[in-house]
């Protein structure tokens, strides 16, 4: 494995700066490095470990990929590269159908990046100063980087904090907002734990708790009380179940899905058929129709689209059958407590209820409202007119190549985003297959020949 070039200068210049060294940033760097001199690129990341980000920095073997290994290659034109890497190591999954541990994929991406010769600067960007059609990036140590173009690849923000969570709760160590960071404490062996959320993050935290020896009852609370569905055998249909010429309304989209199910198409195949065209279908909807989908259908779509690996799904079935996992509907309105534990106040359609917990962990979705995210760089981009919020107030508004729209309605010639930061304009933008396609499109746009 080659050593990654690490730069340390008070002031330097680069052709393209990539802010963020997680999966999104590294995928961008790998694709760009195939079309231009890697020495003209610079990945800026404060953490020493690159490529893994939040999802792939886990060290828990039970945390599995939610995509089959055969579609997890880092390069858009080589989706089976991960399988080839596994085979070279003797780790199996050569047929590409397995759901491998996420930490292995993080290791794979780091290995591919290590041979790219893309320089790395281990700093944190705190401010971005526009300089014509380029930018000066200011680091937290006072150094600066002059970049011809800048790619924002900071990944996910923390989830929205639980309301009415007072200082007693915050300082107790019993409430964890950043569940992927080091926890201030572990729950008592048999004391109850409440996970706010019942999606894939909550599943991961349950597995982490069990791996650490916790044997108590875990209660997941979410608005709809739905768990992710499980992956099944690979199925396919010859065309998307929603034709591109369908009248762009939520009702018509749903009508075509129901027709396909009535004709014998499995729900998994129907959902998977839409993955290549979901962003195009989403772009055709009006703001009103997008809001209608978010309100009435998104929770159903999300559980069907973002599925559990089969071994994980079997584990969850066992947890529920034994009574060690309980899933309830409701909205956590407040958390209070004292040195003995926490009291969780939940509002549900059938009424209010309370739960006592030794610990409460926030497993809800990352916050996409950058107006309230604790990130000075993001706030400055909006304040200076370099960025505007995207669909329904989330993340950034970007064009088809990831370029940010400014307050003047114009597309930036030098500022781009990739990955979860594009949720303001794209429906699918968080999974590796979609992010690597964005990386390829960006590299082709910036370097057409």
Where are these regions (language model features)?
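N-terminal glycine-rich dinucleotide-binding loop that anchors FAD/FMN and/or NAD(P) in oxidoreductases
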Residues: 57-81, 236-251
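Short helix-loop boundary/capping segments at the starts of domains
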Residues: 34, 49, 70, 74-77, ...
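Flavin (primarily FAD) cofactor-binding/catalytic cores of flavoenzymes
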Residues: 5-48, 54, 92-247, 255-449
């Amino acid at each position: 494995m080659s050593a990654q070039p690490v730069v340390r200068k008070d002031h330097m210049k680069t052709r393209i700066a990539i802010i963020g060294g997680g999966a999104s940033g590294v995928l961008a760097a790998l694709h760009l490095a195939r079309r231009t001199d890697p020495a003209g690129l610079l990945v800026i990341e404060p953490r020493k470990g690159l490529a893994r980000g939040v999802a792939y920095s886990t060290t828990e073997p039970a945390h599995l990929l939610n995509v089959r290994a055969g579609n997890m290659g880092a390069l858009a034109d080589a989706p089976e590269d991960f399988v080839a890497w596994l085979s070279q190591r003797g780790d199996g999954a050569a047929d590409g159908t397995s759901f491998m541990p996420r930490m292995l994929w993080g290791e794979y991406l780091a290995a591919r990046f290590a041979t790219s010769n893309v320089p790395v600067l281990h700093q944190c960007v705190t401010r971005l100063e526009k300089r014509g059609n380029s930018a000066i990036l200011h680091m937290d140590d006072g150094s600066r980087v002059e970049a011809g173009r800048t790619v924002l690849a900071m990944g996910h923000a923390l989830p929205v904090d639980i309301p009415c969570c007072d200082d007693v709760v915050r300082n107790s160590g019993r409430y964890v907002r950043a569940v992927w960071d080091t926890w201030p404490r572990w729950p008592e062996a048999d004391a109850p734990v409440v996970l706010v959320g019942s999606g894939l993050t909550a599943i991961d935290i349950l597995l982490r708790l069990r791996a650490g020896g916790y044997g108590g009852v875990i209660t997941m609370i979410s608005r709809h009380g739905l768990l992710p569905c499980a992956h099944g055998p690979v199925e396919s249909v010859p065309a998307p179940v929603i034709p591109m010429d369908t009248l762009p309304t939520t009702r018509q989209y749903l009508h075509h899905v129901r027709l396909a199910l009535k004709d014998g198409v499995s729900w998994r195949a129907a959902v998977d058929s839409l993955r290549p065209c979901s962003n195009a279908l989403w772009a055709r909807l009006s703001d009103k129709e997008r809001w209608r989908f978010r309100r009435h259908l998104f929770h159903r779509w999300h559980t069907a689209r973002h599925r559990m690996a089969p071994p994980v799904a079997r584990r969850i079935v066992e947890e529920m059958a034994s009574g060690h996992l309980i899933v309830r509907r409701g909205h956590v309105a407040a958390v209070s407590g004292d040195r003995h534990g926490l009291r969780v106040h939940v509002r549900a359609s059938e009424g209010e209820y309370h739960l006592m917990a030794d610990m409460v962990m926030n497993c809800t979705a990352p916050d996409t409202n950058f107006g309230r995210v604790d990130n000075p760089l993001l706030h400055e981009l909006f304040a200076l007119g370099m960025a505007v919020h995207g669909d329904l107030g989330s993340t950034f508004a970007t064009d088809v190549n990831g370029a940010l729209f400014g307050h003047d309605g114009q597309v930036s010639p030098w500022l781009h985003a990739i990955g979860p930061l594009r949720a303001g304009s794209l429906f699918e933008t968080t999974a590796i297959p979609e992010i690597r396609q964005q990386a390829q499109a960006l590299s082709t746009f910036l370097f057409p020949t």
